[in-house]
Amino acid sequence: MKKSTKYESTVKDAKTLESVIPKQLAEYTTRALSKLNEALGGDVGGYVANRLHMSHEELREALAAEQIDGVALAVYNIEKRGQSVVIGDQTGIGKGRQAAAMIRYGLLSGYLPIFFTDRYTLFCDMYRDCKALPVGGINLSWSI
């Protein structure tokens, strides 16, 4: 019996990580993404590009389709529901890149993003991910 299924992104013009999703989560994930896509008029990528102040090309260069979906869900939850989100992706799907996108979103939206980790070695990874999503005119400073 197959335990996972191919992830279907709402963003069709971005690179994909060829992710799979546990079969028991597929229906709920598809439903959530469909509702989001409908709420955003079918342009999830455009929504994220707008919120991150990036062109479509810059966005597609920095984030994969799965990551764009994750960032869209997070931003939408903040803006429309006043809620947070937990990124529960497996290793290698880009939780750090999504977190960096949310740091960028926070800085551009007047929030003070704070990154916590239990492993100091992850700060280098987060710095690299933030550099991949640069925020013009904002100096990334780090305290350890």
Q: Which role does the model predict for each range below?
A:
Residues 82-102:
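Walker A/P-loop
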